[in-house]
């Protein structure tokens, strides 16, 4: 029972703080550009306005357009319940498995891209193609890094992997370090940060598939995208930066929640500084910039085989 309560609490907290962290990136960008910029609470206001507006959809819209926002949000909330965020143990272990997480994110990405490709809007189609391209570039390095770490730790469970790294019970520490570097870069790409993308871009870039959405559906999709960013950061921290989380469920989970939020705050600030020190690249040439990440992940896998 305690695990179920903790799982729901994790989902609610991630949903509540996701707009804050997405707004934090915009504030950092404005400060580094020496301009005033929006308030850090602007994303909350935008979501409130969208939820209050009536929804408008084409009569010819397919099931993909209708099902994508609730599906995307459900996947994000499910992963928030399963990841070991506030404690070192996963509240729902079946949702905290690396393979489950990868396939869940792939499912959400597939419907997100399908929503754009299915539309007759040209910008939405470009956005859908962009999502599929980013999937091809990011997922191989993520999978290789995760499998290398899973082989060292003997499990694909996120909590177990984090415990092995926290206690130093790994037979190939160099491989784990390389896998962590590759996974960190892949997570940065997944966040949609410069130079790979711009998370607040307009319809012809990241938010292309949202061009045909409006009202509550658009708000739900935007909230799910913000939750996904927090979950990607939490995913990295749960495996490679697991220190500070309490071992059991209970009152100590409150301290674990504070530590989790501090980790997310530090990560988002670092990502914001890095992002605003780069210039954006065309998404069609991103493959030239991701070979190094795949190479690091492959090298980590090789080091696991030789036991280094």
Each model region followed by its residue ranges:
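Alpha-helical transmembrane segments
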Residues: 6-17, 93-106, 168-190, 253-256
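Membrane-interface amphipathic/juxtamembrane segments adjacent to transmembrane helices
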Residues: 25-54
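Cytosolic juxtamembrane amphipathic/interface segments immediately preceding
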Residues: 46-64, 122-126, 209, 213-217
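Transmembrane alpha-helix boundary signature
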Residues: 58, 77-93, 112-121, 155-156, ...
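Mid-bilayer segments of alpha-helical transmembrane spans in multi-pass integral membrane proteins
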Residues: 81, 100-115, 136-149, 153
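Juxtamembrane/interfacial segments at transmembrane-helix boundaries in multi-pass membrane proteins
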Residues: 91, 148-176
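Interfacial loop-to-transmembrane junctions
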Residues: 270-297
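Juxtamembrane boundary at the C-terminal end of a transmembrane helix
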Residues: 299-308
């Amino acid at each position: 029972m305690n695990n179920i309560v903790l799982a729901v609490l994790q989902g609610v907290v991630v949903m509540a703080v996701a707009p804050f962290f997405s707004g934090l990136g915009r504030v950092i960008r404005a400060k580094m550009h020496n301009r005033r910029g929006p308030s850090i609470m602007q994303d909350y206001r935008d979501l409130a306005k969208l939820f209050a507006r009536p929804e408008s959809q084409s009569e010819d819209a397919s099931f993909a357009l209708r099902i994508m926002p609730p599906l995307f949000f459900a996947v994000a909330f499910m992963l928030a319940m399963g990841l070991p965020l506030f404690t070192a143990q996963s509240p729902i272990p079946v949702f905290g498995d690396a393979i489950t997480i990868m396939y869940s994110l792939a499912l959400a990405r597939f419907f997100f891209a399908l929503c754009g490709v299915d539309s007759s809007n040209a910008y939405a189609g470009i956005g859908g193609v962009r999502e599929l391209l980013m999937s091809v570039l990011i997922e191989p390095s993520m999978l290789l890094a995760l499998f290398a770490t899973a082989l060292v730790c003997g499990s694909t469970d996120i909590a177990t992997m984090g415990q092995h790294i926290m206690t130093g019970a790994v037979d190939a520490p160099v491989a784990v370090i390389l896998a962590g570097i590759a996974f960190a870069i892949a997570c940065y790409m997944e966040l949609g940060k410069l130079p790979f993308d711009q998370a607040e871009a307009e319809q012809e870039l990241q938010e292309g598939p949202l061009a045909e959405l409006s009202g509550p559906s658009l708000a739900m999709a935007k909230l799910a995208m913000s939750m996904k960013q927090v979950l990607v950061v939490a995913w990295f921290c749960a495996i490679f930066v697991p220190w500070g989380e309490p071992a059991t469920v209970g009152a100590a989970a409150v301290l674990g929640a504070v530590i989790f939020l501090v980790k997310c705050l530090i990560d988002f600030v670092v990502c914001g500084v890095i992002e605003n020190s780069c210039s954006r690249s065309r998404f069609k040439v991103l493959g030239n910039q991701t070979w190094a990440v795949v190479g690091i992940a492959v090298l980590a896998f090789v080091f696991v085989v030789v036991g280094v």
